Amino acid sequence: GLIGPQLSAQYYETGYNAYRSEDYKAAIENLSKAVIYDETNKDAWLSLGNSYRKSDDAQNAITTYDKIIELFPETETARSAQRYRSQLAENTAQ
């Protein structure tokens, strides 16, 4: 079991740095791998959802936020996902 979380952490770090540099394509590539290697990596999930949102991919963002809400109920991460998801749903409805 240790290899997955370690790989996840590396992909998360690379992906999060890409996200902060507004390179959302690289962020999505790395963060997608981070959540595959460790499904419990809440930060990677949230950054992935945010990367989709920032690259105007509302559909994937909403899917990712839904997954966070399902995986981590009653957490601050899920509450953040719910807020972003609500904003997107409103924007998409307009």
Question: Residues of each region from the PLM?
Answer:
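Alpha-helical tetratricopeptide repeat
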Residues: 4-19, 46
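Start-of-helix register in tetratricopeptide repeats
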Residues: 6-9, 43, 76-80
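Canonical tetratricopeptide repeat
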Residues: 13, 47, 80-84
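Register position in tetratricopeptide repeats
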Residues: 20-21, 54, 71, 87-91
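Conserved structural position within tetratricopeptide repeats
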Residues: 33-36, 70-73
